[in-house]
Curated annotation (Swiss-Prot):
Main localisation: nucleus
SUPFAM superfamilies: WD40 repeat-like
Family: Belongs to the WD repeat WDR55 family.
Protein name: WD repeat-containing protein jip5
InterPro entries in alphabetical order: WD40/YVTN_repeat-like_dom_sf, WD40_repeat_dom_sf, WDR55_POC1
GO cellular component, one term: nucleolus
Acidic residues biased stretches: 369-383
Comp. bias intervals (Basic residues): 394-403
Intervals holding WD repeats: 9-48, 73-112, 118-159, 222-263, 319-356
Length: 414
């Protein structure tokens, strides 16, 4: 179904990944606190001198992955990344207790926010960051807090306080999925979102706070994504939230009926329990695959489930030892998977059959990053546009088990 266009080695473990909403740009946050932003080669065909169309540079290996900038953004790990809704800003949050807002194009920091401390006075490390609109930034933390920041209010240096704080779950928030705005919305931006935390799902409203929390599901819920345009029947409006569990089960929740799940799909069955469904991403309709979701597994694979049929129809392997913690699709429809010390970019396989299991290992066309010009200081100076040489992929021993809080499944940005 998908073939690897390129494999991009990283200098440290990937903790967070964000995909630009409007350009072929990917940012990664690493265990070392570094943030790096790459521009992917264009998929668009170009005309040769003789007037005939050539294959895209991304497909024939002649393109380059450019490092737009790289810096050590946080002291400690960079746990969360997220682009603003227009892609102009990139928000990062780290175990140093800071949120930093930087220009996506240059990496220059424009604002800093100090995350409120935990009750015992320690750093309340972040788990998710999400720009809901140009005005609202959501930040979830280890203590189960969900902070809302109004981006229109001028910030003093490292002193901004959240406008609201909610606690939709007893445990830390593992995923956050915005719901589409209503038909009567004047802003066009979401004002409600679904979160998972511990064994429950909750819905929170921008103005009214936490509206509903589900029954205990009996297993940890770790990822979520919204999918619309499904067939309507009876009370179903064709809108669902899909939730990935820690035991390999994907549950489907009807929008508006949040008390309990209404369908279950067994994605990864294993003796003694399935593998965690770490991250979810809806396959773009433009690819013509029907209603389908890509699922990044703790075992390193990516499985594709067709909604309606409710069955796994294809699979690719990101890494044989490291789990997938970042997954999404760029503006040109390419899948981007991240986990361990590698990011892979995939395009639709020519002549692929959706019903075949594709275990493509991928071919290395482009290489990764370098630490040569970085120091260990928390510098905000960004390294501009560097071409990446080809480097061999290095296999590493698996050193992170599922369920650790430092491994955050970053959902695709709307």
């Amino acid at each position: 179904m998908f073939d690897t266009v390129c494999t991009l080695p990283l200098s440290a473990d990937l903790f967070s990944q964000a995909i630009h909403p409007n350009e072929p740009v990917v940012s990664v946050g690493l265990s070392t606190g570094h943030v790096q932003t790459f521009r992917l080669p264009s998929e668009e065909s170009s005309d040769d001198d003789d007037g005939t169309a050539s294959n895209s540079s991304a497909r024939n290996g002649k393109g380059h992955i450019d490092t737009m900038w790289r810096t050590r953004r946080h002291k400690g790990s960079c746990r969360c990344l997220g682009f603003g809704v227009d892609g102009e800003m990139l928000y990062s949050a780290g175990t140093d207790g800071l949120v930093k807002a930087a220009k996506a194009e240059t990496g220059v920091v424009e604002n800093k926010i100090a995350i409120p401390l935990a009750k015992d006075g320690s750093v309340d490390a972040p788990t998710i960051i999400h720009a809901l609109s140009p005005q609202t930034l959501l930040l979830a933390t280890d203590s189960s807090a969900l902070h809302l920041y109004d981006l229109r209010i001028p910030f003093s240096n490292v002193s901004a306080k959240p406008q609201q704080t909610h606690h939709p779950h007893d445990d830390y928030i593992s995923s956050l999925t915005p719901l589409p705005p209503s038909d009567t919305s004047t802003s066009g931006f979401s004002k409600q979102w679904v979160t998972t935390g511990g064994t429950t799902l909750a819905v929170t409203d921008l103005r009214r706070g936490v509206m509903v929390r589900s029954e205990d599901q009996g297993e940890e819920l770790v990822s979520s994504v919204y999918i619309g345009g499904l067939a309507s029947s009876g009370t179903s409006r064709g809108e669902k939230v899909l939730v990935g569990g820690s035991s390999g089960v994907l549950t489907l929740w009807e929008k508006g009926a949040w008390d309990d799940q209404d369908e279950r799909i067994y994605v990864q069955r294993e003796a003694g329990g399935g593998e965690a469904l770490e991250t979810l991403a809806v396959v773009p309709d433009e690819l013509g695959k029907g209603k389908m979701v890509a699922i990044g597994l703790g075992s390193g694979g990516v499985k594709f489930v067709r909604i309606g049929m409710n069955k796994v129809v294809s699979e690719v392997m990101h890494d044989e030892t490291e789990g997938v913690i970042g997954l999404g699709f760029d503006v040109e429809g390419r899948m981007v998977s991240g986990g361990g010390q590698v990011v892979k970019v995939w395009h639709e396989a020519v002549g692929s059959n959706d019903m075949d299991v594709d275990m493509a290992g991928g071919k290395r066309m482009f290489g990764g990053d370098s630490d040569d010009s970085d120091d260990d200081n928390d510098s905000e100076d960004s390294e501009q546009e560097q071409r990446q040489p080809v480097e061999p992929q290095r296999k590493r021993k698996k050193n992170k088990g599922k369920g650790k809080r430092d491994i955050i499944a970053f959902a695709d940005i709307d």
